[in-house]
From Swiss-Prot:
Its EC number is 1.2.1.41. It catalyses: L-glutamate 5-semialdehyde + phosphate + NADP(+) = L-glutamyl 5-phosphate + NADPH + H(+). The keyword Oxidoreductase applies. It is found in: Cytoplasm. This is Gamma-glutamyl phosphate reductase. PROSITE patterns: PROA (PS01223). Pathway: Amino-acid biosynthesis; L-proline biosynthesis; L-glutamate 5-semialdehyde from L-glutamate: step 2/2. GO terms for molecular function: glutamate-5-semialdehyde dehydrogenase activity; NADP binding. The gene is proA. It comes from Prochlorococcus marinus (strain NATL1A). PANTHER family: DELTA-1-PYRROLINE-5-CARBOXYLATE SYNTHASE, GLUTAMATE SEMIALDEHYDE DEHYDROGENASE.
Amino acid sequence: MSTNFSVPEPTPQLVKVAESAKEASISLGQSTNKQRCEALTEMANALNDNADEILKANVQDLERSEKEGLNKSLLSRLQLTKTKLKGCIDGVLKVSNLADPIGKRQLHRELDENLILERVTVPLGVLGVIFESRPDALIQIASLAVRSGNGALLKGGSEAKDTNQSIMDSLDKGLRKSNVGSGALSLLTTRQESLGLLRLDKFVNLIIPRGSNELVQFIQENTRIPVLGHADGICHLYVDNSVDIDKAISIALDSKIQYPAACNAIETLLIHEDVAEMFLKKGLPIFSSEGVTLKGDTKSQALGVKNKADESDWSKEYLDLILSIKIVRNVNEAIEHIRKYSSRHTEAIVTEDKMVAEKFLSSVDSAGVYHNCSTRFADGFRYGFGAEVGISTQTLPPRGPVGLEGLVTYRYYLRGDGDLVKDFASGDRSFSHIDLPL
C-alpha cells in the first residue's frame, strides 16, 4: 500500500458491507461450537474441491507479478504450491479441533448472597485484515475468524487478486453449506476500500495488518481502530563461548535459510569473540554453499567475512539470503546490541551455560526469547495455537504469535435480585467476595 494516499471517508457501499459483516458477526458469535466447527469443515472441503482452480489462479498472479517486477521475497510469499495449499486446508481442520474460545468463564465470584459476578470470553466483533502477497493468510485468518465467532473484512494485495478471489469463492461456498452463512466474511478488492476500512471504527473492532514495515506503520498512524501486528522482524541469534559449534551452526542455518522471507528468520548473528574464529572457519563454507551473503563488522571481516556491514545493516530486515555478523565480547554486549536494534520479535541464544542462558532470557525484552533452538519456531501453528492471525511485538497482550486467544475479549455478567448499591454504601449489606468454582 502506498503511503502517499490520504485516508478517505469510506464509500456508502463499503459502509453497507461493514454493516452486513457486523450483523452477521453477532449471529456468528451466538452460534454453537458445533455449528462453527461444521462450518470450518465445509470451508476445508470447498477449498479441497476447488484446489485446481485456486492453484491456476495463483500461477496467473505469479506470472503477472514477475512481469511487473515484484521483488523475490514477495514472489516467494505469493507462491501457493499444492503442498502449501494442502497444509492450509489441513490447518482449517486443525482449527476446528481447537478448544472453543467463546464462553470460557474466567471469573466466578459471589459479591453477596444471590449477587453473582462472572467474566466470560466473547468474540471481538469484526476484524479488518489487510495483507500483502500471502494468499495463505486469507485462509488462516478466515478460519480463525469463524472459529472465534468474528466477522472479517479481508483485503489482500493486488498481486494476489486472482488467488484471493478464488479462495474467497471457495470459502463462501463452504459457508453457504453450513448453518453459519456467508455474510460474516467479505473480500475487499480495491485500494480505496482498504483505505476506507481504516475509518470504519463504528463497525471494525481490530485491524490486523500482514505485510511490509511500510504497510504496518501506515496503518498504525492512520486509524483509531486498535492494530495487532509488528512492523519489522529483525531477529538475532547470539552464539556464546560455552557452545557446541556444530549445534550453533545448524541452528544458525535453520534460523536463516529454512525460509529467509519469513519475519522470524534471523537478520543478525552475534558471536562471542572466544569462539568466533572456530565458528566462522567451519561455518563460512557452509553458509556460502547455501547461497547466503554475509556482511560483517571489522573483526569478522578479519576472520574471512568478505562484505562489510555498515550501521544501517544492523537495523535492516533483509527477508532474503543475507546475514549480518558481529563479534561481541560477551553476553552483555550481545544483549545491548539486541536492545538497540531489535524489533522485539524473536531472539535466541546458543549456549551450554545455563546461567548465561537465563541471563539472556530474562534480559531480552522480545515477544519470543529462545535457548538452543531456531527462531523459526516463532509461529502459532508450531506453538499449537492452530493457524495464527499474526505476530504482535507490543508489550501489552496479546504478544508473540496470536491465535484464537487474541480474537476474543471478555464481558462481565452480574446477576442479582433487586440489589442496590445504596444498601452497601449505608452499611446495611456488606460484600462477601467469595470466589466460586469456574
